[in-house]
Structures are given as structure tokens and as C-alpha cells.
Amino acid sequence: MPSVWHCRATGMARLCQPCGKYVRPLFLYMKHPFLLVWLTLIVLCGCTSSGKQKRHVIGLSQCMLDDAWREAMINDMRIEASNYDDVEIIIKDAQNNNETQIQQIRDLIRQKVDVLIISPYQSEPITAVAEEAYRAGIPTIITDRKVNTDQYTSFVGANNYEIGLAAGNYAAHYLPPNAIILEIWGLTQTSPAQERHKGFVDALREREDLSFRKIEGQWLVDTARMELRKLEHPEQIDFVYAHNDMMAIAAREYFIAWDSIRGRDLRIIGVDAVAGAGLEAVEDGRINASFLSPTG
């Protein structure tokens, strides 16, 4: 599933006057959009107006790092940045706390980073500080989860509605009449969770016989496990759709513990398809399918 790429920077290749090099248009860089967005935004062709090499500092505000998908994102970014001697990445981990993330973003603003990348914990609380960065003249990239403003430079993220739609179309092939679906949500206040839900239910809209149950796992495996233990009548569940693979794996563990035979037969799907987590879980049968959410 391709990334969605929105950017207000338009036009064909730009010429950097000091060194005479062209910066190619963004659509040529879809394989690794994160770093190449930064390179374009700060005209990273290895020079300043004096023609001397300048060190570029990228500030990254992550809402959390304790997650296989985000670990993969960070790893991809570090690998790509290692190709450039003049790029440094400063990574901040908000540990799923809005106030911590706000303070960390303001710290990056004070450091006058060349580019600021924000992956918000929740949209509304982070909106104002994202606007602060943008108004301070720092190119500000929002990734994964959206903010409630247009005061940012660009947004990079997966098409979460299409991910949900694909998951729903997959589910439609396996749902018996009058099936009961358990949906394990990410954080309900975040755009990926809302869009993955909407795509999923839209794909199944014609199936008026279906029923849905919902628990909020908040993207976290431990929270998903805790909420699963509160589930009433697990024997009624015919299908499980989790908003990420780690919560899907937690669901498999729960249902096997409840009934080893039925728990293994129950069809469970997730999202992310990250190497070392979801992909291996599909291969070894812990989950039945995983839908790709690109890390950028």
C-alpha cells in the first residue's frame, strides 16, 4: 500500500545557485520520502550561500518508540541519513504523553533545528505547538497522525482509509452469515485509527447481518491484553481486526488461552507488516494477514 504524500512545495527541479546543482522534484523520491523531503526543503545539495558545506540538523519528535512499527521507521531513517555526512538526527521520545511531546518540540524549536518532523501522540493537543514551529520559520513535517491545522510544510503518511478498506475486503471473504467482528482499535483520538476503522466498515457496508464489538488497545500490546481479558462471551467472536500487528498477536494469545482449538482457528488480521514482527507473525501462523503501513 503506497504512502500518501502531500506537500505544498511544487514545481520542477530547482537550481542551487552557489553550486549549480539541481534538486530533483519530490515525486522521483517516493522510495525514501522522509529524508528526501528534508533534502528538498533545506536545499540539501551540500552547500550554503557561501558554497561551504553546512551541517543540517533534523529534529524528530516521536510520540513513542516502544512499538515495532516505529522502531522500523527510526531504523529506516537512520540508515538513509547515514548516506549523508552532513545530516544529524535528534530523536525525542514522548512516551505517549502530550505534555512531554509539547515540551520536547519546544526544545527542538529553541535548538533551531533545520527541519522538524512531528509524529503526534494526539492531534488536538499537539496542533498549537506544531503551529509554533511553523511560524518560527522551521520547515515542519507532520507524519503518521494528522494535526488540526494547515500551518505545516508537508504531511507524510499511509493512506489509512485504503488500508482499512483492504482489510474489510479481505474479511468479507471469510465472514459467515451473522458474524460478530471484534475490532481492536488504536488510540481512538488519532487519525490512523479513525481512518482504518472507517475504511473497514465501508468495505462491509452491504453486509447488514454483521455485528461489531470494539475494544481500545491504544496501539499497545499490554493495553490490548488487559482489555481482552475484560471481553465478555469470547466464544461469540468470528473474526478479529486489529489496528496493528502487535495487538493482533495479543488477540491470538488471548483466544488460544481461552480455547486452544478455537483460538487457533479464529481468523485474526492486523496492520503494519513490519519485518521482525507482523511479517513473521503471518509466516508462523499467529495472525492470518497483515496489511502494509509504510514507515515512510
At which residue positions do the language-model features occur?
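C-terminal motif of bacterial Sec signal peptides marking the signal peptidase cleavage site
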Residues: 44-46
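Flexible loop/hinge segments that line or gate small-molecule binding clefts
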Residues: 123-162, 173, 180, 274-283
